[in-house]
Amino acid sequence: RIDQGRYKHLNHESVVNSYHAALSGGQPYQFVTDALVRHEQNLRLNILSNLFSRLGLDDFESWASKHLLMVEYFELDIVPMESIENQIKDMVDLRNDASHGEIDNLVNVEIMKSNCNFVIKFLEVIRQFISTKLITKMYSQGQIVKLGKVTESFGKNGAFILTAEKGASITKSDLVFIIESNKYSSQTIESIQLNGINLDTFKITNDASEIGLKCPLLVKNNAVLYKEI
């Protein structure tokens, strides 16, 4: 509770004022870090999912189970929740044994490498999940614009056809936010082509205009592109 224990340095007025400044767009603003980073429970999958849901970021478990990084790690087409839960539980148990007791047997090096690999991939899944939710929210509030949807992809060279939305503009070197099914990335536009002609910039004047674009990496069919206003 505020004003007790580890939170005795806080008071209700300062906490409310800090959040009001942040939500009102005041600059600079400050987060109440005590509320953000302190948690009594080990962050197992259900705890993480619950934390995200309380922030309005729903369906994390479904996102994680279908993400390519989890599919690659577990070598399954769709990863059961139990597989991710058990992986996290095993690491939490290992950490607890090391912190609060004695480990009878040292963990195999390959197991440690596998655990580290999982953590790296899982953190990237979390980053992409939050980024996707953020982009969707920013678009709904008019802070970014939708460029259109990819209707044809030419593979790993990064070239694709975008069916663009009226009113948007695209310029070489633009940073675009790319939302695919269970994946988020950001890339820069390397080239723009219309009717075989290379362009430096293009203003979209008609709905469903098709324009050729190229990014450094593969952009798949049905991906939706956004950019800052």
Where are these regions (language model features)?
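Sparse, context-dependent recognition of short Cys/His-centered cofactor- or disulfide-binding micro-motifs
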Residues: Q4, L76, E82-S83, G196-N198, ...
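Helix-loop junctions and short alpha-helical segments
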Residues: R1-D77
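N-terminal short leaders/motifs
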Residues: R38-L48, V107-N108, M112, G167-I170
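Beta-strand/loop-dominated core regions that host nucleotide or nucleotide-derived cofactor-binding catalytic loops
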Residues: G142-I170, L175-I229
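Histidine-centered active-site/metal-ligand motif
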Residues: H100
